[in-house]
A protein has these predicted regions:
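Phosphate-binding P-loop
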Residues: 4-10
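Hydrophobic anchor at the beta1->P-loop junction of P-loop NTPases
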Residues: 15
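Walker A (P-loop) phosphate-binding loop of P-loop NTPases
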Residues: 20
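Conserved lysine of the Walker
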Residues: 23
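Conserved substrate/cofactor phosphate-moiety recognition/catalytic segment
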Residues: 28-77
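Glycine-rich phosphate-binding loop used to anchor ATP phosphates in small-molecule kinases
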Residues: 64-112, 133
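Conserved phosphate-donor/acceptor-positioning beta-strand/loop module used by diverse small-molecule
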Residues: 90-92, 107-126, 160
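Small-molecule kinase domains that catalyze NTP-dependent phosphoryl transfer to phosphate-bearing small molecules
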Residues: 117, 125-174, 181-185
Length: 185
């Protein structure tokens, strides 16, 4: 048995949603609160991971379904390695692919899937990275939820539907309460 497998398994909190949904914002707040309570937590962000794993890819700029799937499975494998070392992993990633959701449920210890469901109209209004503006201008393609089909999670452990005025603090409280209720943290 490998040394990784001798530890008590950790857990993976997988926060998914379209670009601009607030995944990273929520993840950072959840991580801060968990760390404040004494948990050892690793924060992973899909944008950072794309740079790390994509650096060895043939086409770093590709956002095709195939490229997204390959990267998301790599992210999931990294989460598993970390969770097998008794760590809590919080990951913020689009990864709206049924193959990823299924793989995660089957292979990640303490897996808890969060889906931030935000209408495209609201995402276009927020557009923190200019993705929706650039898509509308014809500058980019393969935008999840627009010209690239997504698979909404069918069995997310928690779905946070957009509500005007709902703050990240409120979302964080709701998520942490759900994690406690499900005995994830």
């Amino acid at each position: 048995m490998s040394a990784l497998m001798t530890c008590e398994p950790g857990r993976v909190i997988w926060i998914t949603g379209l670009s601009g949904a607030g995944k990273s914002t929520l993840a950072h707040e959840v991580v801060a609160r968990l760390r404040a309570s004494g948990d050892v937590v690793v924060m992973l962000d899909g944008d950072d991971l794309r740079e790390v794993f994509g650096a060895v890819s043939v086409d770093l700029k590709s956002h095709s379904r195939q490229a997204r799937l390959a990267l998301a499975i790599q992210y999931a494998h990294m989460c598993r390695i970390l969770a097998q070392q008794s760590l809590t992993v919080v990951i913020a990633t689009i990864s709206l692919l049924k193959e990823v959701h299924a793989w995660n449920r089957e292979n990640l210890p303490g897996y808890f899937e969060v889906y931030l469901k935000v209408p495209v109209e609201e995402l276009r209004r927020r557009d923190p990275k200019g993705i929706y503006r650039r898509f509308d201008a014809g500058e980019i393609t393969d935008v999840a939820g627009l010209d690239l089909a997504i698979d909404e999670p069918e069995a997310a452990d928690w779905v946070a539907e957009f509500a005007q005025g709902r703050t990240v603090g409120v979302l964080t409280d709701e998520l942490l309460n759900k994690l406690i209720e499900k005995q994830i943290v």
